[in-house]
Amino acid sequence: VSVDDLVGGVEGNGLKAALRGINHARTHVAATCVGQAIRLINEMIPFALGRKQFNKALADMPTIQNMIADSYVEMNAARSMTLEAARLFDSGDIPALEISSAKYFASEMVSRVADNALQILGGAGYLEDNVITRMYRDTRLFRLYEGTSQIQQRAIAKSLIKNYRDRK
């Protein structure tokens, strides 16, 4: 391969350039999951406020409130993890552990938030074509591309085990 065609521009830098690219993409997936969760929360609350059961808004029922609260807390945790991974990435390092953790948590989180949103909509969420139904289907993809959840788990565990071994 000629010097002009080397990935990374310098011999020996190709892997680092490739890893930088995939880790950038994984950070982007995590951030997208956070954005999707925010949208889902912003869709579920008005529905819960407007839908009545037993002469009471769904939003006033403790079980529904718990689902809304859980969705927000998980979204906020994923946002914090993603922002920290991005901050470390922007510093020039490749924080693979933090990025895999953020991508794994955020992609699993958005599926749970989508499930909560669909649960709040009830049968209408399953039978009718609406934004939450579409997002419920679409969020499943986040656990697959740029490395499945199982690949992220493996990367996280391998990194932690290596770090522990290196300390000894």
What positions do the PLM features span?
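Active-site lining segments that contact anionic ligands and/or coordinate catalytic metals
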Residues: 12, 24, 94-96, 115, ...
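Glycine-rich beta->alpha junctions and the first turn(s) of the following alpha-helix
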Residues: 1-76, 142, 151, 158, ...
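Alpha-helix capping/hinge segments and adjacent helical runs
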Residues: 100-168
